[in-house]
Every structure is written in structure tokens, then in C-alpha cells.
Amino acid sequence: MERITVTLGERSYPITIAAGLFDDSASFMPLKAGEQAMLVTNQTLAPLYLDRVRGVLENSGVHVDQVILPDGEQYKSLTVLDQVFSALLAKPHGRDTTIVALGGGVIGDLAGFAAASYQRGVRFIQVPTTLLSQVDSSVGGKTAVNHPLGKNMIGAFYQPVSVVIDLDCLKSLPARELSSGLAEVIKYGIILDRDFFLWLEENIEAVRELQPDALAYCIRRCCEIKAAVVAADERESGMRALLNLGHTYGHAIEAEMGYGNWLHGEAVAAGMVMAAHTARRLGQFSAEDVERVKSLLVRAGLPVNGPTQMAPEAYLPHMMRDKKVLAGELRLVLPTAIGQSEVRGGVAHDMVLASIADCLA
């Protein structure tokens, strides 16, 4: 068992990583006998894990209710969020309840935002079941729903009280979803940890095959990096913005193509290559390193080109709604070397468009 702490003073919390955590009620601390919990999951995961998690909580004396939501990025919306609020109010649940988010990034983001909003804030526990949510979205307190005009535009910073990562969940994860998560894994190596990038170049196939030692190290290292970044910059006023490598381009793909048609990690993968080409055109990232990034993404089962039906000009309106835009100026996360990156403003739109065009299949 691995345990990592996200250090935020009185709001610090543990990330627990191991196989078989769903069978141990201690995994869901600080929930205890006599307390209420609302278990939030989706229609795909409910048959796999709902009875198991609910059972271990009820056997420990927790009073559990549940809400099962539709599955997919297109359902990370205010309309579906209202279903969670309605379920909480119907029982009813008070300010001492705990929301348990059992699912991937959509469930974690949506249930977390429900926790941040319901009665001005209740506890919640992240129980991520996809690789992407285990290595990224469950850690750090970003919660949100989407708007038709932009991804994650309605949300809050709100930290969980714990993150429970059961490695056994990945055994049921479709290969495409696993690859989607690997985009965020590779991102950490590009932006902050050259040694981890080199390790991935040697071990990416072992991770895709779910070899236990490689998988455990991969998830642990990602959580260590994310925890350190969040502890240093919880509200993304500085270095935390580096975690958005590829996301400004990728969110444009998701919004333009329709949420769910491109998985988040797929869009981020293409976006990271676009960012790499932008950095190359600026003279701060070598063509050789662009190819190394592309090669690793391909080996991870990810796209390195944007959608053919999306012209470069279609990206900019979405990119200008990005949360890093300041005073109308587009700001991009760009690599400066493998393991190093920066937030850069003032990049000419023509250069951005040319870099996107570099990535059209």
C-alpha cells in the first residue's frame, strides 16, 4: 500500500493506492458508523462496483443512499448535477453528509462540484476508477461541469477529504480509456520530470499491460507530482497552470467535436503535440523532442493529429475562452525541453494556427 499526502494545512488529505481497497471499510475514512453518505456513480460502473462499495460502507454502520447517473462527458452538465442535488434533498441529507464519488473524471468533477455547492459545502471522498482520474482529476480539488460554450467553465476549487485508488478497477477499463489516461501520465514527464519521461519510454508497454509493479509506480509517481504542485499552488496562480499542457488546444477539440466524441485524453494528446510544434516554431523545443513526444503517445495508443474535419481557424474561438486568458491575451503552456515547461503569452495567432496545421492528418 502506498500513501501520499496532499499538504494543505488543515485541509491536507491522503491518497491511498493499493489493490483490494474496496473490501476494507478503513479505506473510506473519515466516514464512520452512524454517518450519512451519498454514493454517486454511473450506469456503467454501478453493476461492477456499487454493491461492493455500498456493502462495505453499510457493514461498517454508515447509512448509504445512492444516485446513478448516465455515463459520458456529455452528461457533465448542470442538468445532471441537479439530479445529485435532488437525491440529496429527497432523503434528506444534511451538512454532515459525505458524498462518495465512485467513477472517472466526469463523476469526480460533477460530484465534487455538488459537494462544494450543497448547503455551501459538504465532505466528499474521491474514488477514481479510471487511469485518467487516478493520476490527475481526483487529486487537487478542481470540480466543475461543462457549458456548451466551454469545458469546465462552471466549477469551484474544493478539496476532497481523501482519495481512494483501488488498482483492481483498471482490470475492467476498456483499452481506449486506459490510453486516454496515459495522455495525462505522459504530460507529467513532459512538463516537470525528465526522468519519469525516460522511464515511460522504457516501460509504457508494461503499463498498458497492467503489469503490477509498473502500474503501481506509474500511478504513485503521477500522484506525487500532482500533490507537490497542488501543495505549492492550490488555486493555479503559478506553476499549477503547467498541468494544463495540451489542454487549451484539447478543450477546443472536445467542445467543437461534441463532448464525448473525443475522449479527454485523446484530445489532450493531440493538443500536446500542437503545443510541442508551437514551442518548436518559437525555437524553444527541438524537432527531435517533438518526435520523441509523438512516438511515446503513439506507443500509448493515442492520436497525435487533430480531427481532419476541424480547420485550424475553428480552434481559436474556443481557445480564447480558456481560463488562462488574461486581458484578452492567449496564454499557452509550452515545453522548453523534455521535463521543463512554461506559461507563455503573446504567441501570435498565426503561429498557433500554423502549429495546429502541423497536426492535421
Curated annotation (Swiss-Prot):
InterPro entries for this protein: Dehydroquinate_synthase, DHQ_synth_AroB, DHQ_synth_fam, DHQS/DOIS_N, DHQS_C
GO MF, one example: nucleotide binding
UniProt similarity note: Belongs to the sugar phosphate cyclases superfamily. Dehydroquinate synthase family.
Main location: cytoplasm
Binding site for NAD(+): 71-76, 105-109, 129-130, 142, 151
Pathway: Metabolic intermediate biosynthesis; chorismate biosynthesis; chorismate from D-erythrose 4-phosphate and phosphoenolpyruvate: step 2/7
Gene3D superfamilies to which the protein is assigned, alphabetical: 3.40.50.1970, Dehydroquinate synthase-like - alpha domain (1.20.1090.10)
GO cellular component, one term: cytoplasm
Protein name: 3-dehydroquinate synthase
Species the sequence originates in: Pectobacterium carotovorum subsp. carotovorum (strain PC1)
